[in-house]
């Protein structure tokens, strides 16, 4: 029988490392709640990024997935994960930095992604997963609360920005619930939140997404400027383009919808 999460981590003398952005979850009931939000189904394929001491890993495995592949950069955690693997042969362990893996080579079938992501790689990894990996059916991620609010923000709100636009033209997004700092060891200085991201079946092309990224980088750098001013150098006939698209030339970056940005990108 596996020891508790706390005893297991203690027996391996694993303390969180700041360089890996580690904040461990010892509460198995919270792990179970996250897995319920993800709606992991029996016989599904799951990838967990950064399993650490294996709290979420255990909760996923209890749902009896067809396979669970965990990607862990911290070699100290590998022996602990190997011990979990002795009880669950459907667990596959990859010791690697997820930012250096070619994820398209790793994923060969439809997969669910679940992760308590380190804050310092969260935004970069979300965008990369959405842009590069076509076989992800859904992602349930723990991120900094502020980042989740930006992902899910609607136009004309303070949180709305580039991240909102890119995520929402590639996926359906939904904030599930907040997680207090006290749920982690060590306690982070900010709240976290769970977000569910369901990639669209027919997303825009990478070329079009790259254009949206180019446009949003310009307009949100001066979000109080009017769109016609922000895009004048990139699109010399911007007034004509916006008029054709029936977008108000005097609108600011935060007023346009993700769909508006896609429509502008199509004119580039």
UniProtKB/Swiss-Prot annotation:
Catalytic reaction list: adenosine(1518)/adenosine(1519) in 16S rRNA + 4 S-adenosyl-L-methionine = N(6)-dimethyladenosine(1518)/N(6)-dimethyladenosine(1519) in 16S rRNA + 4 S-adenosyl-L-homocysteine + 4 H(+)
Predominant location: cytoplasm
Keyword match rRNA processing: yes
EC number(s) per entry: 2.1.1.182
Annotated compartments: Cytoplasm
InterPro entries assigned to the protein according to its UniProt record, in alphabetical order: KsgA/Erm, rRNA_Ade_diMease-like_C, rRNA_Ade_Mease_Trfase_CS, rRNA_Ade_methylase_Trfase_N, rRNA_adenine_dimethylase, SAM-dependent_MTases_sf
Binding residue positions for S-adenosyl-L-methionine: 23, 25, 50, 72, 97, 116
SUPFAM superfamilies: S-adenosyl-L-methionine-dependent methyltransferases
Annotated signal peptide: none
MF terms (GO), sorted A to Z: 16S rRNA (adenine(1518)-N(6)/adenine(1519)-N(6))-dimethyltransferase activity; RNA binding
Entry GO terms, CC: cytoplasm
Record's keyword terms, sorted: Cytoplasm, Methyltransferase, RNA-binding, rRNA processing, S-adenosyl-L-methionine, Transferase
The keyword Amino-acid biosynthesis appears for this protein: no
Domain of life (superkingdom): Bacteria
Similarity field: Belongs to the class I-like SAM-binding methyltransferase superfamily. rRNA adenine N(6)-methyltransferase family. RsmA subfamily.
NCBIfam families tied to this protein: ksgA
Function: Specifically dimethylates two adjacent adenosines (A1518 and A1519) in the loop of a conserved hairpin near the 3'-end of 16S rRNA in the 30S particle. May play a critical role in biogenesis of 30S subunits.
Protein name (Swiss-Prot/TrEMBL): Ribosomal RNA small subunit methyltransferase A
Gene behind the chain: rsmA
